[in-house]
A protein has these predicted regions:
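A generic structural micro-feature
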Residues: 4-8, 53-55, 70-74, 98-101, ...
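Beta-strand/loop substructures that line and gate deep hydrophobic ligand-binding cavities in soluble
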Residues: 90-140
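Hydrophobic ligand-binding cavity/cleft-lining segments
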Residues: 1-45
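Hydrophobic pocket/interface hotspot
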Residues: 23, 33, 61, 80, ...
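Hydrophobic/aromatic beta-strand elements that line small-molecule binding cavities or substrate pockets
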Residues: 14, 50-53, 76-82, 93-94, ...
Length: 153
């Protein structure tokens, strides 16, 4: 029996030791994104040539991770629904060609002062419980990697 996809929510909150503008760049500039996106699980590579970002409302987002061991590719793509620099991004990820049946990711960055930023990433995704757990593990690993990079600057 195949498990039916249902609306699942994943929320990750982190306080980062970096100014909000730098965290914003980490999410919106390919040279920054390739250093942490999807690499938290290690064993995955995101080359700059595999990133397309048009960070404007209606602009597109596409990243293709490559598995270092077997060359398998995993693509995430979407459309920026909302862009409020340097505070908020909303990305709509349609189901076509994806491992899920549609998702919306909301990024909120709050300036805490003293060079610190609270980052909240909330993804609402149509998927199975098992795939949600896998997605949450991957997202948490990527966010941990982002925190490591920002704190080592």
């Amino acid at each position: 029996m195949t498990e039916a996809a249902t609306a699942q929510e994943i929320t990750i909150t982190r306080v980062l030791e970096a100014p909000r503008e730098l965290v914003w760049k980490a999410w919106t500039e390919p040279d920054h994104l390739v250093r942490w996106w999807g690499t938290g699980a290690r064993g995955w590579t995101l080359p700059p040539s595999a990133v397309t970002m048009e960070v404007t409302p209606g602009g597109t987002f596409r990243v293709t991770l490559t598995n270092d061991e077997d060359g398998t590719e995993m693509t995430t793509e979407g459309v920026y629904r909302e862009v409020v620099e340097p505070e908020r991004l909303v990305i709509d990820e349609p189901a076509e060609g994806a491992w899920h049946e549609g998702a919306v990711t909301e990024l909120t960055l709050s300036d805490l002062g003293d060079g610190r930023t609270e980052m909240v990433v909330k993804t609402t995704i149509q998927t199975t419980d098992e795939m949600r757990r896998n997605a949450e593990t991957g997202m948490a690993g990527s966010v941990d990697r982002l925190a490591e990079i920002l704190e080592s600057r």
